[in-house]
């Protein structure tokens, strides 16, 4: 090996290392940057903007905001729960009650980004769900459970109101798409 090829090999190794870092950080960085744009879109929605999409080509828009005071969580909830939507934030599951209305509100998110904090929730913790009229609805966590995806009747009619937060499980799984789901159930505070 000549002395001239050593700098080239070093440069190639540097580029490969940088590429590996960028590839590994892509999803967390995208999730972080999207939250800034989503916060601005949420403010536009609260002000009554007709189009509150976070960027012009977005196929979703902010629908609500979820906060958990003890953990310092504050996230915009998007309309829909497709993979493209969930790449940017938690999403409202179609067919469930809309945030702020009576019924079973279901919100899903990825276990390794936006809903990683679900594993730290405790029974009795408060969840605040803000709707686009600016009102906060307070819920208390009553249960966290692990279910197989086939046994979750998330959209079944229920007696009373509740909020369910849903993510894949286990939180530290190496590969995505497992059959287990982590479900947090919360009832309106004072109920």
Please annotate each region the language model reported:
Residues 1-6:
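Short, Lys/Arg-rich N-terminal segment immediately upstream of the first membrane anchor
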Residues 7-191:
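Solvent-exposed, non-transmembrane regions of membrane-associated and secreted proteins
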């Amino acid at each position: 090996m000549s002395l001239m090829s050593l700098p080239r090999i070093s440069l190639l190794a540097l580029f490969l290392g940088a590429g590996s870092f960028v590839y590994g950080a892509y999803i967390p960085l995208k999730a972080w940057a999207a939250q800034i744009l989503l916060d601005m879109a949420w403010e536009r929605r609260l002000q009554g903007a007709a189009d509150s999409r976070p960027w012009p080509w977005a196929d979703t828009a902010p629908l609500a905001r979820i906060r958990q005071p003890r953990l310092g969580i504050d996230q915009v909830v998007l309309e829909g729960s497709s993979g493209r939507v969930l790449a940017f934030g938690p999403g409202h599951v179609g067919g469930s009650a809309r945030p702020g209305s009576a019924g079973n509100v279901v919100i899903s998110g990825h276990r390794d980004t936006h809903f990683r904090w679900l594993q730290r929730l405790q029974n009795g913790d408060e969840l605040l769900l803000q709707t686009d009229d600016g009102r906060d609805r307070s819920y208390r966590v009553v249960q966290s459970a692990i279910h197989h995806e086939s046994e979750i009747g998330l959209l079944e009619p229920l007696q009373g109101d509740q909020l369910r937060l849903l993510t894949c499980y286990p939180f530290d799984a190496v590969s995505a798409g497992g059959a287990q789901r982590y479900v947090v159930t919360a009832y309106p505070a004072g109920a």
